[in-house]
Design a protein with these regions (language model features):
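Catalytic core of pol beta-like nucleotidyltransferases
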Residues: 1-29, 38-43, 54-140
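Short hydrophobic/aromatic beta-strand micro-patches
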Residues: 50-52
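Glycine-rich beta-strand-to-loop/alpha-helix junction loops that act as flexible
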Residues: 33-35
Length: 140
């Protein structure tokens, strides 16, 4: 097995474990983003996931870090409530833009389509373009 294929197989196994562990949180969508979504991952890359679910900790820091999910090797997961993530988009927080622009939904109940639609509307309305190291807003 080639190194990239091995890493991809390990990532699929880790993501599967996260999906199982996330079930009590009632996930609406789980989005793979970062180097594994782009395909430019290496041996030292983390597996970046955004977990948007109905049952999240009340504390914002606990939602972002989801300590119980961080025990899975190489997985870095950030949690959001559905309305909270949509608000991040509307507030034009570029982390949310990165997640949607390069993200691949791993599981979804239809929420991702709503998120993607909101993202596409903002990109059109504000003339937003992705740059190699950030974003440009042409029409504030």
């Amino acid at each position: 097995m080639l190194p990239k294929e091995r890493l991809r197989a390990e990532a699929q196994e880790a993501v599967g474990l996260l999906v199982e562990r996330a079930k009590p949180l009632k996930p609406r969508t789980i989005i793979l983003f970062g180097s594994y979504a782009r395909g430019d991952f290496t041996e030292s890359s983390d597996i970046d996931l955004c977990l948007i679910a109905d049952r999240m900790p009340d504390d914002e820091f606990a939602r972002r870090t989801l300590p119980d999910m961080q025990e899975i090797p190489k997985v870095r997961v950030m949690g959001f409530l559905p309305d909270e993530f949509l608000e991040y988009l509307r507030d034009m927080r570029f982390l949310a833009f990165d997640i949607v622009a390069e993200g691949i939904p791993i599981c979804d109940d239809g929420l991702y389509r709503k998120i993607r639609g909101a993202f596409d509307d903002l990109v059109q309305k504000h003339g937003i373009t992705k740059l190699p190291h950030g974003w440009r807003i042409s029409k504030p």
